[in-house]
Amino acid sequence: MKNLFKLALCGLAFVLAACGQGIDGPDQPQTGITYKSCADKIEITGEAQEVTITITADAAWTAQVSNSKLATLVEGESGEAGTYDIVLAFSENSSLYSRNVTLYAKVEGIAQKVTICKITQKSVSEKGTDANVNKNFTWPILEHYYLWNKELKEKGNPKWDQAYDDFLDSALQSIYPKNSMDGYMYTSSTGQQQWVFYSYIERTTPTTQSVTRAEKAMYQGFGASIYAITFDDNAKYIHLAVEFVYPDSPAAKAGLKRGHYIGKINGTTITDENYYKLALENFIYEVPVGTTCTLEVSEFDWNTLDLSTQTETISMTSATYFENPVLFHNVYTYTSTKDESHKTSIGYMIYNSFDAAFDDEITKVFDVFAEEQAEVGSLDYVILDLRYNGGGNVASCRYLSSLLAGADALDGAQPKVFMYSRYNDDRMAAGGYNKNDYTTYKHDDFDKDAAMAYNFPFKEIYVIGTSDTASSSEMLINALRGIGKKVTLVGGRTNGKNVGMEVMNTQNSGAIDGNHYIFAPITFQSYNCKGESDYDDGFVPDAGFDLEASYEGFPLTDWGTDFVSAMRDGQEVYYMPDFFSHALNAILEKEFPVTTSSVKRMSPRNNASLPKQMRRLDMPKVAREGDIFRKNAWVLAE
């Protein structure tokens, strides 16, 4: 027998805010929805049931759900202006995990669809509260390890009778903003803001536990990262832009690449009504092995500054694959046409996450750099692309930083300090932690090739960063600047995560009420060898390189494209299509001034403008089972 909820009734304990509320207000973007009977977020139990939500719309409207496999619309799919009930049917959630469904409404005359509410359906195995795990696992760890444990203990009165993830969230919120370094403000494309904590807890399976160690995690699906983009002010012209594909993934083998724009999936045209659902089912959620997907893709046409009318069909079949974080690498060598002895070589690597299981892939890239250095005589610059890198394992960060630092990481025969760590006062006192407790750069004690063996005499290190660049990525910038390396930041302001996590789990202590957990609280703040850690608002791009607000952040070409030429009004014009182009051009201007060389390059003043109507749309942020790095974690994992 299904349980029937009527969310128009106020006073229910699981509703997170006042029941009846309007969406549009004097200071809010207009949505066309003036009333809804639910909070922004609600929770329901795992049993099969129906949920009814009442809305009032100003004009004709249609309802959508983010995943029709989890919930279906059985009443109120559309209507005219007025007040209506929307009924969603949920099947029983017999999995180990909670699952999320978002209800949307698209109102006639309003460009963007509006989020009515996000519904979390607990697993039937969850009894409504997790008092045991809250009392005996989460809270003791917070009391001992959390960086703001003193403030948490002073606040006291934890609410044990909650779901395990809600317990953590309410505990952290209880001392906000004292712990404001534990999180960031997320702003959607419609201007809605939400605070997101870095600290997190997950209910896991034994498979998930292995991700905290240096073992390669295997995934199933196509292996492509996408987001929605519109070239039209009314947001009706929707494509899924391919940001990147993992090497050797099914998508890569099928020919899908960065710079492709997906217009159809299995014959269905992508629109503002279905892009969210199609993205979830084909690229965000794991796809069963053997599933075939046919895409119609196009590329950006630099002559028309619009998507090309020519399309290509790509068919790919889901399989298992590894997420190698080294997405692309290359070496670019330029020779002056006026003096052939004048050469400069530039190494380029796109690194997506600090994953210790793939440190050997970093070594392979630097082997390629070393080969180029031996052939040309030098490798003068390196461009490290961290635009999508939200962090990861500190040991991997330490290794890559050592490779980049070379001999500058040494003080005589001894390695310099890579990082100082500050823990909470209780741990500092009890454990004798002080500023003399530090981590050095890797030297010849590294269990692979000695990090200093390459010793590239880089004149300058360019780092490409964005607001997604966080944690260990920022640690690398801070550490290298701390020993005097010239690091130039290109792109946008970074995330600002100068704190890190230690990952705890129940694998050794045993299951709690039949479940295992991974808990990653913020436990330390990081400083470079100069004692600097003042980047909680992010690192600001260097002068002339603040580009994130421009269109170079869109995937308009494949990786490593230097410049693009096109015909405009009968004349040849040049474009710098990416952050990489700007970094490369800056290097060439230094090495080959116009008066001394005719090396092909361009000046920013000649860079033609890109179309103003290009706009990125919000996409779902879904954590997969086992993906512990999803919230920009620094992981002190063995």
Predicted regions, residues:
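Structural beta-strand segments of beta-rich domains
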Residues: 49-53
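C-terminal "post-core" interaction segments
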Residues: 342, 346-349, 353-364, 372, ...
